[in-house]
Amino acid sequence: MSIVYVAGFVDVVAYPKVDPVLYLNLDDVSKCLPLTKPIPLNIEHLPESTIGHTIGLYAVTHGVFCVGVIHSEKFLHLTENLFSNSCVAQATSKFLPYQPLLEMLHTWLPALSLSSLCPTAQNAANTNMFQHVSLCALGRRRGTVAVYSMNLEDAISQFCSISQAEVENIYQDSKNVDINSLPKPVFNIDPHILMAKAIDAGFIKDRLQLLKTDKGVAKIKKLTYLKASEIGKPVTEDISEDMNQHGIVPQGSDDLISVPKSTFLSMLQNNLDNFKQHPRPACFPQYFSPQGAYMPYELYPPQPYSGDNIGYMLPSGSYVPAMFPSRPNKRKREDFDDCVFPGESSLYKDVLNLTKNISQLQDDLKDLKQAAINQPNRYPPHHFSNPYSLDPGHASYFRYAPYGAPKPDQHLLQPLACVQQAPVVQPNYAPPPTEGASNEAPKPSVQEPVHIDASFAQDPVSKLQKMFCDELLNK
């Protein structure tokens, strides 16, 4: 008859308890220990699932330690059959010998749970303080992890929290127990109940993490069959063959959602519009030119103002085109995008029309915002110093012209000293004729020579003109 030994803590004194019911007073419990009387060893506290008995409960420095034996042939046969269908149990370690029975027990029932009386009912005279010990998926007390082995000494020596003297004492007391003298376990439970308990264990929150904590609290060695450590690779399953046989597993309902075609396209268009609205980051030239490069006097020449949507030529000679706001592409909405079932057309069309109207309003608002963002800023015209004079040419360009002589002002009058006036000739009138001389022949009149005044002497009228011109020039 094959048997399996199980060992582990049913209570760790140093670890705090969440529920006061789980608290055990070690001073009172030590009076009932060691317990050499066998008590039942069952599954998940089910009375019909007795699979073995305990062969000793001991009080050690770290807590209360339990040693038991599983000797139900029916249960061991069931466990071996479960191993071939469990992928987790087949994830073995290459550093440990291949033991299917131990692998399945550590996967299915990795913890211990002690059934004892309530702390208020505990007393030294009560000899039935402990009812049974259960193998379960997760114990309520921390540190209550189980270790299965075919050898009794190997199962006890896996715990580093027990001193060597305590290990020898427990081993000497446990090995003297006659397994054949133990009562025959009654394992008559319905397999459906065990399946239900296994399903409930799958929904324990952070079960794997708690098992790792229990392993650390109990101070178990690293190389064990316990699955609360690193999981190895399966030894028998072929992944490629399994995929060809069963096909690709479809994704669950939580990973997939159904969205109408029009809604998806609207969301995609909104993302594109938001992406276009973000302006490109401004690029500024470096503050200082690299070594050996030409350094102009003006690092940042001001931009000439040329109005809205008109390109201009930079002093470096590069042409900057005009910026016009671009309208995003609009998709024509089709009536047959969304299909409706018979009897729902009237209600669905009303909702669809309202949705389309709201979507159109949102698109119009986005277009207005985008047009406002893309519109260039207006700067007032300002004068600036430039080594070249700007001569207006074409309406959209500026061309350069060299410096020329300033044109004379036409509205200014020249000074009087520079103007030469024509000489004034005064007429010479002859005296009237007399009676005595009327009979005489008329003598030809001799004209006097005209005298031209070429001196610098000025007339009073010329002085007034000069004063008037000087007054105009000085203003």
From Swiss-Prot:
Molecular functions (GO terms): identical protein binding; serine-type endopeptidase activity
Its EC number(s): 3.4.21.97
InterPro entries, alphabetized: Herpes_virus_sf, Peptidase_S21
Ranges for region Interaction with major capsid protein: 455-475
GO biological process, one term: nuclear capsid assembly
Motif Nuclear localization signal mapped to chain: 327-333
Entry domain remark: Region of interaction between pPR and pAP is called Amino conserved domain (ACD). The region of interaction with major capsid protein is called carboxyl conserved domain (CCD).
Similarity section: Belongs to the herpesviridae capsid scaffolding protein family.
The protein's name in its UniProt record: Capsid scaffolding protein
Lineage per the UniProt record: Viruses, Duplodnaviria, Heunggongvirae, Peploviricota, Herviviricetes
